[in-house]
């Protein structure tokens, strides 16, 4: 077993790698503090925590495939007790997530029972250029399987996703791997099938507890794998007092006055992602109102 100092060197890291003789590329990511920071200010049911972890890993792996600066939003909306699950990540591997629950969700509740009638929406937003949005049917047992199907349909590329969530040494962890045949057409289905068969043997404790290099060696010790430098992954909400102020400016003066009257002369705005509170008293509100003039 790898000791703690060894495995933690790759906590909250994303690696890209390439099989030299197979024309197949891969990615690996593990979320430790990033996942904990996401959950810290919320009391999500266990099934929702696991789903968010799965979606976060998927989003990290998806953003690593971008050939441009931008971000990807992976969002589930439904009419079940889980009304919304949303993850947003960018090409810098900054990620945030939130969920809205309205009803009882048991620990082992299935994806379909949590969501009810719903869809999975992926929005790709380049910093320059047009946004792209894909709507995916939730007709598979897991988000991972739905996303694999999305890759096949949208990019027509053989793709394997392996994503696991759980605990390691008493702390929440989510990790995953992506394998994809190269889009230049040089890879063969046989090569891809060979590598995915090996990847499918990975154990949870290996994904959660091994450094990337050792994990890849265990899975592919007979292959030549080029492992590229890691990219740091971190929770990043992006909220600020300025953004909260801008949101207040969209509300009519009459409605703001009603809110102030109901809440003893101050407005408390709380970020859904990180839980930060932004307080605005009457003086601050009047100053904001003056900027509308």
Give each language-model segment a name.
Residues 2-229:
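Interaction interfaces in information-processing and related assembly proteins
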Residues 199-293:
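Cys/His-clustered metal-coordination modules, chiefly Zn-binding fingers
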């Amino acid at each position: 077993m790898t000791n703690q100092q060894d495995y933690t060197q790759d906590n909250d890291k994303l690696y890209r790698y390439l099989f030299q003789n197979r024309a197949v590329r891969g990615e690996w990511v593990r979320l430790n503090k990033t996942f904990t920071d996401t959950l810290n200010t919320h009391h999500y049911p266990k099934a929702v925590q696991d789903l968010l972890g799965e979606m976060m890993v998927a989003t990290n792996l998806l953003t690593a495939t971008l050939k441009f600066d931008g971000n990807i939003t992976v969002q589930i909306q439904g009419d079940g007790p889980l009304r919304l699950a949303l993850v947003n990540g960018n090409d810098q591997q900054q990620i945030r997530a939130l969920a809205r629950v309205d009803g009882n969700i048991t620990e082992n509740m299935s994806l379909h029972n949590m969501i009810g009638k719903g869809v999975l929406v992926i929005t790709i937003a380049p910093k320059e250029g047009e946004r792209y949005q894909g709507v995916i049917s939730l007709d598979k047992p897991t988000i991972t399987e739905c996303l694999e199907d999305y890759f096949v349909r949208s990019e027509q590329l053989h793709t394997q996703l392996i994503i696991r969530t759980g605990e390691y040494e008493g702390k929440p962890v989510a990790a995953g791997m992506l394998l994809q045949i190269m889009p230049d057409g040089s890879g063969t289905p046989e090569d891809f099938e060979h590598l995915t068969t090996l990847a499918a043997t990975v154990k949870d404790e290996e994904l959660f507890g091994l450094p990337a290099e050792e994990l890849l060696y265990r899975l592919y010790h007979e292959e030549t794998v080029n492992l590229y430098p890691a990219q740091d992954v971190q929770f990043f909400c992006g909220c600020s007092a300025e953004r909260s102020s801008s949101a207040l400016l969209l509300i009519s003066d009459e409605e703001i006055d009603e809110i102030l009257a109901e809440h003893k002369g101050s407005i408390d705005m709380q970020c859904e992602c990180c839980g930060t509170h932004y307080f605005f008293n009457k003086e601050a509100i009047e100053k904001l109102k003056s900027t509308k003039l």
